Swiss-Prot record:
It comes from Treponema pallidum (strain Nichols). GO terms for cellular component: cytoplasm. Homodimer. This is Aspartate--tRNA(Asp/Asn) ligase. It catalyses: tRNA(Asx) + L-aspartate + ATP = L-aspartyl-tRNA(Asx) + AMP + diphosphate. Belongs to the class-II aminoacyl-tRNA synthetase family. Type 1 subfamily. ATP binds at R237, D238, E239, Q246, E499, G551, L552, D553, R554. Its main location: cytoplasm.
């Protein structure tokens, strides 16, 4: 406690008054009461003989006042306190004068007039201001993550993550799901991304892998008869980091027996509606739209479409038979595709240089050019307009183009390249443009994926999702004859252009699983070594089953409007998969390496 004879902070304080109320809970009904607050100095200022500071804890902020006239010693002490110093304050709650009410704070109608104050912990010079962390370099924020986490925006994000996790558990428990933990140390398998591996001390030369997902174990739980399983599973993938990826992440993992694709999708829609309603008060639609993989590619140029941005790719093959533009004519003559993207009201918004920047995006996706037109004055101008003289009205009619619209085109003999390149331009425009629907949550299911995709580098078929997904029934007889035409019983859930969840109906038959192994080039010996325990389990009355996994980090990122999943994880890794906070990963000393029978060559 500070008085005229109390020294400045002198080591750890054990005996201090514990809080009687949280900072953010004070209201007018508390006026006249004596309270004790515990928290941090958020901001401070002085007006002559009166000093003010905002005191903060997880619940919010309240203003504290110390007057030199009332307590000269305490006033002197407050002027020496640094921001983010940890305090205990005892004082009287008083009503603010009407002219001093702060409507930006929930506590803005009151203030606490301090009588005593304890410094519980001093604060060093701050590497950045906690209330202004957006201007700090990310690695500095990660190095001092405990300070970054004090900011209101990070406190709100981490608290929302907790509410989301709680809502998930509540909903799934109500629906009869059982939360079961699966192993963290598993065998390495030859699919997916690179594994993180852990050497075994007791079995020299052998290694555990950290799970990329609980896939095989949740299928075994279905064989075991648990029927409905879920887990907020910690997963690990050794892949290059980017904004929406981390080497360690959390999955909302579900598996169900005796279900169809529609059953799984319905449960997940209901779960998300419950989560959004209870955690952020948002009502989602009663039905999520669906697109086939082919439709998504044709209309959006991607299997992860952002449905908030209304313009879609349009079929413009007719332009190869109108006008005199040779590149379009040649593409159509060779059976290729022309796709158009009409941007309403953007004719005057993009300079030639900006359009060239968009063209570089299309070229990065194998397109040769990005062609353009502007609809003005009832006709067309700029770009390739001169090649369509006399047919401007027909072009505009077929593409529903209005005056002041910007029209972008990609033409290519390869239909997929045509769509993907223009889809990439569309995605870039979404990132750069401000549009009215940006704050919405727009879900879409993508279904009917190819079961396999061709890997030209290794000259073999790869599973499009993973090798435990079932083909659709009509392809069972012809799997080996034409793998490229086989559609899987697969489904992805996309939110605002991000893959939020991925799932499938699983294989539950030993012979079908072996056929899939063979198609993807897994020889019987390796398949038996890596997955024999699964195919063996299928011999003992395995039920039909299916499931899905959501990215919890990505879900919370999108719910909070964050730029990266690093902003919704308490202690994330940076883009190099390292932690500036504790210098992880670290070097092992020789004794540890010897115990593990390892030699490091760097």
């Amino acid at each position: 406690m500070y008085s005229a004879h109390t020294p400045w902070y002198d080591g750890q304080v054990m005996d201090y008054p514990r809080r009687t109320i949280a900072c953010g809970e004070l209201r007018r009904c508390h006026v006249g009461t004596v309270v004790v607050l515990n928290g941090w100095v958020h901001r401070k200022r002085s007006h002559g003989t009166v000093s003010f500071f905002n005191m903060r804890d997880r619940s919010g902020i309240v203003q504290v006042i110390v007057s030199q006239e009332e307590n000269a010693s305490l006033w002197s002490t407050v002027n020496r306190i640094r921001l983010e110093c940890c305090l205990a304050v005892e004082g009287v709650v008083r009503e603010r004068p009407p002219s001093m009410i702060n409507r930006a704070l929930h506590t803005g109608e009151v203030e606490v007039h301090a009588r005593t104050l304890y410094v519980l912990s001093e604060n060093a010079v701050l590497p950045f201001r906690v209330d202004d962390v957006v201007h700090a370099h990310e690695d500095i924020r990660l190095k001092y993550r405990y300070l970054d986490l004090r900011s209101q925006r990070m406190q709100e994000r981490i608290a929302l993550r907790s509410r989301v996790a709680l809502a998930i558990r509540q909903f799934l428990s109500m629906k009869g799901f059982i939360e079961i933990e699966t192993p963290t140390f598993i065998c390495s398998t030859p699919e997916g991304a690179r594994d993180f591996v852990v050497p075994s001390r007791v079995c020299p030369g052998r290694f555990y892998a950290l799970p990329q997902s609980p896939q095989l174990y949740k299928q075994l739980l279905m064989v075991a008869g648990f029927d409905r399983y879920f887990q907020l599973a910690r997963c690990y993938r050794d892949e290059d980091a980017r904004g929406d990826r981390q080497p360690e992440f959390t999955q909302i993992d579900l598996e169900m027996s005796f279900v169809s694709r529609d059953d799984v999708m319905r449960v997940n829609e209901d779960m998300l509606r419950y989560v959004f309603r209870t955690s952020i008060g948002v009502e989602l639609p009663t039905f999520f739209p669906r697109l086939t993989y082919a439709q998504a590619l044709d209309q959006y140029g991607t299997d992860k479409p952002d449905m908030r941005f209304k313009p879609v790719l349009q079929n413009a093959d007719f332009m190869g038979m109108l006008g005199t533009f040779t590149p379009f004519e040649e593409v159509v003559a060779q059976g290729g595709s022309i796709r158009a993207l009409v941007l309403p009201g953007k004719a005057r918004c993009y300079s030639r240089r900006q359009i060239e920047a968009l063209e570089s995006i299309a070229r990065a996706h194998e397109a040769h050019h990005l062609f353009w037109l502007k609809a003005t004055g009832g006709g067309l101008e700029g770009g390739i307009a001169r090649f369509f003289a006399g047919v401007e009205s027909e072009v505009r009619r077929r593409l529903s183009a209005q005056d002041e619209d910007l029209l972008l085109f990609v033409a290519d003999c390869r239909h997929r390249v045509c769509c993907v390149a223009l889809g990439a331009v569309r995605s870039a425009l979404i990132r750069d443009e401000s549009f009215p629907e940006k704050e919405l949550f727009s879900f879409v299911w993508i279904v009917d994926f190819p079961l396999f995709e061709w890997n030209p580098a290794e000259n073999k078929w790869d599973p499009a999702h993973h090798m435990f997904s079932a083909p659709q029934e009509q392809y069972l007889e012809t799997l080996e004859q034409d793998p490229g035409s086989v559609k899987g019983d697969l489904y992805d859930l996309v939110l605002n252009g991000y893959e939020l969840a991925s799932g499938s109906i699983r294989i539950h038959d030993t012979q079908l699983q072996k056929r899939i192994f063979k198609i993807v080039g897994l020889d019987p010996e390796e398949a038996g070594e890596k997955f024999g325990f699964l195919t063996e389990a299928f011999k003992y009355g395995a039920p039909p089953h299916g499931g899905i996994a959501h990215g919890l980090d990505r879900l919370v990122m999108l719910m909070t409007g964050s730029e990266s999943i690093r902003d919704v994880i308490a202690f994330p890794k940076n883009t190099l998969a390292a932690s500036p906070l504790d210098n992880c990963p670290s070097v092992l000393d020789k004794r540890q390496l010897d115990e593990l029978h390892l030699t490091v060559h760097v």
